[in-house]
Amino acid sequence: MHRALAVPLVVLAFYALRTPAVLAQVCVADQHGGLVCGEGSAAMRVVDDTISPSKNYAFAWRGAQGLSVGDPPPPGVENLLIRISDGAVLAKLGGEYWATGEMRANRYELVAAWSPDSRSVIEVANSRWDSDSFAYYRIDGAAAAKLDLRALVEPVMTARLPPRKRQGNSFSVRTDRPLTLDARGRLRFTAMLYVPKSEISNDYEVRVNIRTTGGKPSAQVVSMRRVRAD
């Protein structure tokens, strides 16, 4: 049986980091049907299934030596929020996912959940055991403001556990469950605290309200409900 949990009002506000867009080059299709922006060491490749509803923005990746990959994987991988029309970089993301159309990072994933108006996006960058980055980005012209959602949600989830079970857990947003952000900034998702390589998992359905005032995003956890781990 699902058990509803009372959640104290938790508010997290950050100074809006507004990064001026850094221009690259126009994005064009490559031989694998993906979009590549720029050339040489400055080249970036759009990550599949991360393009905004407006088709104006997307997540992309680049390496310190461009997009060439081999064995070992490319060094210095960065994930980015870009504008597709001119390849402008609006923000640096927190993950290290890469994919060329032929190969991709093993046990990494990068997921985007866009608002219907394409002005806001949620980043989920998962590695094998953790969500390395779980963040909200608000686009305003040539700048993007970032809000760290993991820093908000994980402590609230941890506080729900008995004290003896609060240590040694990994935090991960479940990308196999619905992850939605509506036009009013209401975010819904499922996350878990679990012990790697064990069957111990504490899963929660979470609702967070996000708002932006004066270019500064803030958020609050409005509900958290324990659910069965699948």
Region locations from a protein language model:
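Positively charged n-region of N-terminal signal peptides that target proteins for export
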Residues: 1-4
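Beta-strand C-termini and the immediately following turn/loop, strongest in propeller blades
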Residues: 61-65, 71-72, 123-128, 190-194
